[in-house]
Amino acid sequence: MLPTVNNNIVIALDAMGGDFAPLSVIQGASFFLDNLVDPGVEVFFHIYGDQKEISPLLSKYKKVSDNSEFTHCSDNVLPNDKPSFALRHRKDSSMKAAVEAVKKGKAFGMVSSGNTGALMAVSRFILGTLPNIYRPAIASVCPTKTKSFALLDLGANVDCNTDSLFQFALMGSIFAKIALKVENPEVALLNIGTEEVKGTDSVRGAFELLKNAPSINFKGYIEASEFLDGNIDVIVADGFVGNVMLKTAEATAGTFISLIKQEVFNSWMTKMLVGILLKPKLNKALERFNPKIRSGAMFLGLNGIIIKSHGNSDAISFAHAIKFAVNAISENLNQKIINGVSHIE
């Protein structure tokens, strides 16, 4: 049964994490309540942070205040804190308190825009992993020219063995069914070629396990040059490769969009022509790559739902990260991962 208050889904919020916190967090919660709650779903927040900063915001955003409980925390995790430092010395941080709310059953998930490494360390220490899961992985939804796909690991594990990559594929497949609404997700391993003999020992070992796993719709290897084609639903890599791939893609997309705007809008004539002829289609195409509606990475494999929003998230971005958490809870993601792993074991 889901943790609820008066039948509401409960989400813990780290109000002090992120470049624009706590304003972005409280505004994000307000935007979520006003615009992103599905019919029949009610959400309640446990908010953790500095009372001097949070109280005026809760007075201003009445709907958030009416649908939340606030707890003061005397400390917060800083962007440059090492994971070990945050774990040992930030004892009364808003991040730690929000994760502990999940551990204690006060909430079933938490959202933070704070330090990624610290959040993973704190979450793993407090919550632990799901039964039979070796390592957690960071997963996110990425756009392509035709559809979205799930990518993991995005940095939790710099080096992975065969069994971890296999479990990432399993968790990624279950995650994609929920996040992408795909009934039988197609899964691929990221590699330097599509031939079976290529890749590291871990990647080749995972290939052998996956091609003999009936519960996973495995399609073999995929190269980085192919991932934007939209032919695969889940791409699996170790955290080092996955993180580099994601950041390279984000930087390339950002540069390309900037170049288009620079060239297209360099004169009043082209501005007018684009406004008349192309603006609706251009906006529709660019919306697919809008990071604000994809602001959320999930820490898969932990014994609780943990969502990491971008560090520079604004209110809309943070609201969509909350939505991400609510969907995972509503779909009972972790129980489905437990069931999936038990069938393999």
UniProtKB/Swiss-Prot annotation:
What is the top-level taxon of the source organism? Bacteria
Under Pfam families, the record lists:
FA_synthesis
Q: Which reaction does it catalyse?
A: a fatty acyl-[ACP] + phosphate = an acyl phosphate + holo-[ACP]
One GO biological-process annotation of the entry reads: phospholipid biosynthetic process
Q: Does the keyword Protease apply?
A: no
Q: Major location, coarse class?
A: cytoplasm
Could you say which EC number(s) this protein's record lists? 2.3.1.274
Q: Which Gene3D superfamilies match?
A: Isopropylmalate Dehydrogenase
Q: Does the keyword Ribosomal protein apply?
A: no
Kindly tell me the pathway this chain contributes to.
Lipid metabolism; phospholipid metabolism
Q: Which GO terms describe its molecular function?
A: phosphate:acyl-[acyl carrier protein] acyltransferase activity
Subunit structure, interactors included = Homodimer. Probably interacts with PlsY.
User: Which HAMAP family does the annotation name?
Assistant: PlsX
According to UniProt, the name of this protein is: Phosphate acyltransferase
